[in-house]
Amino acid sequence: MRRRDLLAGAACMAVSSLVPRVGAARGRTPYGGRILLHAPWPLNAIDPHRVDDMAAAFFGDALFETLYARDADGAFIPSLAEGDPQPDGATLRITLRSDIRFAAGARVDARAAAASIARARAHDAAAWLADVPAPHIDKGVLVFAMRDARRLVRALASPLVAIVPPRFAPDRPDGTGPLRVEIQAAGMVLSRNGIAASGPAFLDAIDVRRAADLVTSLRDFESGADDMGWLGSFLHDPRPGAKSFDAGVIGWAILRTGRDAAAADTPGTAQALADGIPHAALAPLVVGSPWDQGSATWTGAPADLVVRDDAPWLVEVARALCAAMSQPSHEVRCVTLPAAEIAQRRASRGFALMIDVARPIGPGPLGALVGLATADDPASAMALARHPPRGDVAPRVATRTMRIGVVGEIKLQGGRAPDVVLPPSPWGRGVDWGNAFRSR
């Protein structure tokens, strides 16, 4: 039995009836053990309310939860909320469960939830929450001045609207998920959260260590030191008994154009340049299926393509792009910069070209579209969320009207030890780490 399967049957029950069922589930699934892996991504902070936080994309669902969650069948069910929104005149009222606490011990109440929703809106969830008014609190209940319960639940179920405590600090993250996290110099340790809102994880811990390059994970997995291999199963020789896993697309590497790109800084140019890169140039980085290659090339003056220096996978993407885009008199040079400087340049648009990341904000094509639009321009994303296009729009098509272009997919896949079981996330993107276990 999966941990989150318990939520569907227990949403309207008292917590006293939930605990024995969690215990029963533990009897059928091996309990304990650790997983060790190396990740070529920044691991010094994690913020669920940011569309460019890949640590949150990979591990956020294990640490943070939302008022409503998605079950294995794709339906939305109460999670931190006690039940469905209740109509009251022209408003909807949401009561939180009274038994829940953050991993650090503070209570999760209506004030904390309202503050967290406000924080999400102030960061990257504003467009996704465009039709959701800020709640007020009445007798410990969240009150939303709207009538559409289905729309409210869908909005509040987004991972970018996860509930975090007041004064949340990304370098000291705290949540209600099945695992809690400690940021360390070598990476992050996700350990079982004994007071998790939907039950603690099966595993004792997941050690995620920072990889300085793309070789480290493959080498250590091949030798048996690691339990998972990032993007592959071996460096030289296959590991005996190793299994593969593919947890799908959790985001995109994107190309940005900035003010220093001069005439190339126009909507659609970034995607045209990205489409002009041969798939073969990026295929070793596992960026998804081939695309229809275009003919656009960089025709501007020699320029720098900047990328944050603490994301080895992203640096390799940038280097591959520079090699593919450069031509005599139109060279593109890869320049690595500290994350803080990348953020400053992104805010001021003080660059020619930049490699960055984005992730979906919600489910389905609309969630992907709003995530990309938010990465491009939050104001435009707001308008798009209120008036979405008809039908499904592929990411590479959607960005033809933006100053960003999809370079390739960011996938969570590779090799795993034969006894490591990695269930898929109910969102269809990533691993359900709370339900991961080691078979015996």
Region locations from a protein language model:
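N-terminal lobe/hinge region of extracytoplasmic solute-binding protein
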Residues: H38-G89, A118, D174-T176
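A structural "hinge/loop" feature
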Residues: W41-A57, L80-A81, A106, L152-V161, ...
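Surface-exposed binding/hinge segments that line
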Residues: P85, R93, A126-F168
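Alpha-helical secondary-structure segments
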Residues: D109-S116, V143, D204-A205, S223, ...
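Gly/Pro-rich hinge or "lid" segments in bacterial periplasmic/extracellular proteins
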Residues: R150-D207, A212-T216
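Extracellular/periplasmic solute-recognition and catalytic clefts
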Residues: E182-V189, D207-D260, V357-A358
